[in-house]
Every structure is written in C-alpha cells, then in structure tokens.
C-alpha cells in the first residue's frame, strides 16, 4: 500500500526557533515512518523580502543542517531546496492564470507583511500563496501540516486544485490539512499572547535553535509571568498566559504532562519554574547544536543531500507539470 504524501517547508530567512522545532520540525520527524515525506527549504519564498545574497546562501545550508540535526533523515524523506527544482516556478506561473486577484487580495498574511515591509510591497509578496499552492500540488500531496497562519493559504491551494480539475479532469490531488495530535504552540517570552516568531524584531521574545544556551537561560529567567500574590503555577492561557507558555515549553521538552507539572510546582515560586525550563531547554539545545555542527561542517555531505533530494523531487514534479501542460494545451518539447 502506498504511503500518503506529506509536503512541508520552511524559509531559510531568520534562525529557526524552539517554536518551529516543537510545533513543526519534531512532528515532521515523527511522520517519516508512516508517510512519504517531502520537506523543502523554500528559498524562492524567502526573496519576497529583501535578502543579502551571501546571508541567504549561508542560511540555506544552515537550515538544511538544522533539518538533519532535528532528525529528518534523507534515507526516509525527500529533502531539497526549492530553487533546485524549476517545476515549482513553472507550475506557479501556470496556476497564476487560474487564481483570481480578489482571492489574493483577501490573504491576511499579505496585509500583515505589506504593512511591515511598506518600502518593498512587491508582486512576489502578493503572489506568494500561488507559489505555495504549486509547491503542494506538484507532488500530488495528500496532507499538509499547517499552523494557524497558513490555513488560509492551504484553503486557496485547495480552491485552485478544484478549479483546475473542474476544467481539465483530475490532474491534482486536493490536499487536506494535517493537524498533529500533539505539538506545542510556543509563545513569545515577553508577549505571551502572541506566537514566538523567528522574524520578531525583539530577540528577547525568541529562542533560536542555534543560540548560546547560556544566553537562552538569561532570556527564560526574564520571561513574563504575572503579579499574582502568592504566585500560583497553574495552566490558564486566558488569565496566566506567561506561566502557561513556560509550562507548555517544559512539557514539550521533558514529555511530562501539564497536570504533572502543575503538581510538581504546587506552592513554588515562578523562579523555580523558570529555572527548570531554562535547564531543560539549554540541555536540549546543547545536544541539538552538537549534531548541527557535525552536519554543518561536512559541506560535501550537505551538497550530496541537496543533489539527491532535488533529483527525487524533480522526478515526481516533472510528471505533474507534464500533465498540467498537456491539459492546458502547450505543445510538448520535442
């Protein structure tokens, strides 16, 4: 029986955070045995915001080494760089012609990013969701792990696939969202009502996977809790967002349940909780960074992973693009 196909990716812009790891990368690792996993470093999406060329090249290799350090296995999964598989951009252009301006105008992420990068509101930023649809549909993807911020884009991918299929027959699989049974939603350390984001300008809000564990300890000890007297370590996202975030992080790192942790910290000060979180996270990062540096220092291996991954991805992508071009009426290349 063929395994269902899963597609996901991350941009090589900004350092990946513990939020990316606990909410996404760790789920990707766990899916490798039960699904045919295709994991992409989406460098073409990254250039919708201005990038320094040298930094982008470095960030791409850094991200690949992090994928591997987190446990993504090139023997089990297809791992590749988006720009190495030209079918992504080719299908993206074709799908533009089956996507309506009004649909893209309603994308909330475009509104957010165009407000943030007002000096560079480019067509690529507006068109980003169509390239994302191409990324997904190229591989006849069954399932896409998505967070809240990408649900709208996946819905558009489904709409485009259904519209194209209505015109030309069943060319595309219509992808479904994959909602993992467990996966921590890690919030900002100083503003715990918003998600931790690798693009946050205030770096005290964020814990990067490659940060010095000593600086991580300091950040966690400065994390927002609340002013309850006496302090109560209780999971209550509405009324105790900072404490709940620390409990979520500790639970994700140690595997202990929230009720177990509440019992463990009953009658204790917030400083005790922060100390435990700091020790657990810094220990996890120390081990992960050791694996990361081993991969990052072996550039020949990284080049081989990218080459093999692009070849595997292209074999699949070219079949879909050929079917699309035939359906549209393009003359086949002699």
From Swiss-Prot:
The keyword Nucleotide-binding is assigned to this record: yes
Catalyzed chemical reaction(s): tRNA(Trp) + L-tryptophan + ATP = L-tryptophyl-tRNA(Trp) + AMP + diphosphate + H(+)
Any one GO molecular function term: tryptophan-tRNA ligase activity
Gene3D superfamilies assigned to the protein according to its UniProt record, in alphabetical order: HUPs, Tyrosyl-Transfer RNA Synthetase
Residues reported in the UniProt entry to bind L-tryptophan: 135
Positions bound to ATP: 11-13, 19-20, 147-149, 186, 195-199
UniProt short sequence motif 'HIGH' region, positions renumbered to this chain: 12-20
Example of a GO biological process term: tryptophanyl-tRNA aminoacylation
Major subcellular site: cytoplasm
GO cellular component, one term: cytosol
UniProtKB keywords: Aminoacyl-tRNA synthetase, ATP-binding, Cytoplasm, Ligase, Nucleotide-binding, Protein biosynthesis
Biological role stated in the UniProt entry: Catalyzes the attachment of tryptophan to tRNA(Trp).
Quaternary structure (record): Homodimer.
Name under which the protein is recorded: Tryptophan--tRNA ligase
């Amino acid at each position: 029986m063929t395994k269902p196909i899963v597609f996901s990716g991350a941009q090589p812009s900004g350092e990946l955070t513990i939020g990316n790891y606990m909410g996404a990368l760790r789920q990707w690792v766990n899916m490798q045995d039960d699904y045919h996993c295709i994991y992409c470093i989406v460098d073409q999406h990254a250039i919708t915001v201005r990038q320094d060329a040298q930094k982008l090249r470095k960030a791409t290799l850094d991200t690949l080494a992090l994928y591997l350090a987190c446990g993504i296995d090139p023997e089990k999964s297809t791992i590749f760089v988006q720009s190495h598989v030209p079918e992504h951009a080719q299908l993206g252009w074709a799908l533009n012609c089956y996507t309506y301006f009004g649909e893209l105008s309603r994308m909330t992420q475009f509104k957010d990013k165009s407000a943030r990068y007002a000096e560079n509101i480019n067509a690529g930023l507006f068109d980003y969701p169509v390239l994302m649809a191409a990324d997904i549909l190229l591989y006849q993807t069954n399932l896409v792990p998505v967070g809240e911020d990408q649900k709208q884009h996946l819905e558009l991918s489904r709409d485009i696939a259904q519209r194209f299929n209505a015109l030309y027959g069943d060319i595309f699989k219509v992808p479904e969202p994959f909602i993992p049974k467990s996966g921590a939603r890690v919030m900002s350390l100083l503003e715990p009502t918003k998600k931790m984001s690798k693009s946050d300008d205030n770096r005290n809000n964020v814990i990067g996977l490659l940060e010095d564990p000593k600086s991580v300890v300091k950040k966690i000890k400065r994390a927002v809790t609340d002013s309850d007297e006496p302090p109560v370590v209780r999971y209550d996202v509405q009324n105790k967002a900072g404490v709940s975030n620390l409990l979520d992080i500790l639970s994700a790192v140690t595997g202990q349940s929230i009720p177990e942790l509440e019992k463990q910290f009953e009658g204790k000060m917030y400083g005790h909780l922060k100390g435990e979180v700091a020790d657990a996270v810094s220990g996890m990062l120390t081990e992960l960074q050791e694996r990361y540096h081993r991969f990052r220092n072996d550039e020949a291996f990284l080049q081989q992973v990218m080459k093999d991954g692009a070849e595997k991805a292209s074999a699949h992508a070219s079949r879909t693009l050929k079917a699309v071009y035939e359906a549209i009426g393009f003359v086949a290349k002699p």
